[in-house]
Amino acid sequence: MDEALMPREKLLKYGAAALTDAELLAIFLRTGIKDCPVMQLSKNVLQHFGSLRGLISADQKQFCAMKGIGITQFIQLQACTEMTRRYLLAELKEGYCFSSSDVVKMYLQTELENTEREIFLVLFLDNQHRLIKQERLFLGTINKAMVYPREVIKEALACNAAAIILAHNHPSGVAEPSFSDRQITEAIKQAAELVEIRVLDHFVIGKGDYFSFAEQNLL
């Protein structure tokens, strides 16, 4: 690979996946500032925030405090993030069959990992494990969401779901499930079994991490 290529030319020749985080960010930023070319600015920004994830997760005040980037770049990045979220949701909606959890995990992380309050979300699936709809059923405080199994089952029956996937975030950033997380998962599973609905998984979303009950054989 020709290391002398500028990021945009490198992308056109080899594809976006061949670029480093700094090169991708340089394309996004487009220009540098006085005495700091765009590639150096990109590296400075990544060093300041720790990673692309750290940059994307930054709030407006944190983002704009970094020399060389400001409100325009913040708005553009928020728009890009939202477009990515909608793209992933569209991928799920368009007859997506849940034979692999990779797209699901990516979507759930985009949807939940940067929220300040705990959100309990449910994906409702048909008998071929295709998405019928998703619902944010419960919104909690900074560290707790009140989840009622009967409401989950009520929604599942209303849309004739054959299976469900549960997900919630931990605003603390730690993806390890709590004792109450395990309790509510078991309660929903037992309630679902009474009406022949399968609980396929329960994802706990943290900062850059997740926990899958199914992957850990807890369902």
Protein language model features and the residues they cover:
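Long, highly charged, low-complexity intrinsically disordered interaction regions
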Residues: 1-63
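Short HxH-centered metal-ligating active-site micro-motif
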Residues: 139-177
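Short acidic/polar active-site loop segments enriched in Thr and Asp
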Residues: 17, 162, 198
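C-terminal extensions
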Residues: 16-17, 21-31, 35-40, 87-135
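Alpha-helix N-cap and loop-to-helix initiation/capping positions
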Residues: 176-184
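Divalent-metal-activated hydrolytic enzyme cores
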Residues: 139, 186-219
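Conserved hydrophobic/aromatic pocket- or pore-lining residues that grip, position, or stack substrates
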Residues: 129, 166, 201
